[in-house]
From Swiss-Prot:
It is found in: Cytoplasm. Pfam families: FliW. It comes from Clostridium kluyveri (strain ATCC 8527 / DSM 555 / NBRC 12016 / NCIMB 10680 / K1). Signal peptide: none annotated. This is Flagellar assembly factor FliW. Keywords: Bacterial flagellum biogenesis, Chaperone, Cytoplasm, Translation regulation. PANTHER family: FLAGELLAR ASSEMBLY FACTOR FLIW (PTHR39190:SF1). Acts as an anti-CsrA protein, binds CsrA and prevents it from repressing translation of its target genes, one of which is flagellin. Binds to flagellin and participates in the assembly of the flagellum.
Length: 145
C-alpha cells in the first residue's frame, strides 16, 4: 500500500504493519491507525505516520539511544491491555520536538509510546511515578524542564 504524505513523500507499507492505537495519541485521539517508518535523513529518528491523515506524522526516537538507563514499569493491566506476553515483543519510542538549532531538539521522556510489534497495537503512556522530563535535550547531556 502507498501513502502520499505532505512532509515525507510517498511511503510504502504493508497492511500487516499498521499499528492500531485504540485510544489514539494525545492530541490526535481521532486517529487510530499509524505506520512506523525509519526517517530517511537520520537513522536516529522514526516517523509515526497516520494512515488516516496524510498530514500527520510524528517524529519519534528510541529513548534507549538517548538515555541508556531509561526504564519504567508496565503494570499488569497495561500489559494485558496491550497483549504483551514477552518483553521482546515491545518497541518503545518517544516523541521528538525538532528545532532549527540542534541543541534545542528535545525528546519527551515522560510519555513513552509502547508498541506491541507482535500484535501491532500501541499506546502512549504518561509516566506518573518516574521523574523524567518532557523536554530532554537530544544532543547534550543536560536536563531542562
Amino acid at each position: 500500500m502507498k501513502l502520499n504524505t505532505k512532509y515525507h513523500g510517498l511511503l510504502e507499507y504493508d497492511e500487516k504493519n499498521i499499528v492500531v492505537f485504540r485510544k489514539g495519541i494525545p492530541g490526535f485521539e481521532h486517529l487510530k491507525k499509524f505506520i512506523l517508518v525509519p526517517a530517511e535523513e537520520n537513522n536516529l529518528f522514526y516517523i509515526l505516520h497516520s494512515i488516516e491523515d496524510e498530514n500527520i506524522g510524528i517524529i519519534v526516537a528510541s529513548p534507549f539511544d538517548i538515555l541508556k538507563d531509561y526504564e519504567f514499569e508496565l503494570n499488569e493491566d497495561k500489559t494485558a491491555e496491550l497483549k504483551i506476553e514477552n518483553m521482546e515483543d515491545i518497541f518503545i519510542v518517544n516523541t521528538v520536538t525538532l528545532n532549527s538549532v540542534l541543541e534545542n531538539i528535545t525528546i519527551n521522556l515522560k510519555a513513552p509510546i509502547v508498541i506491541n510489534i507482535k500484535e501491532n497495537i500501541g499506546e502512549q503512556l504518561i509516566l506518573d511515578k518516574v521523574e523524567y522530563p518532557i523536554k530532554y535535550p537530544l544532543f547534550k547531556g543536560e536536563v531542562s524542564c
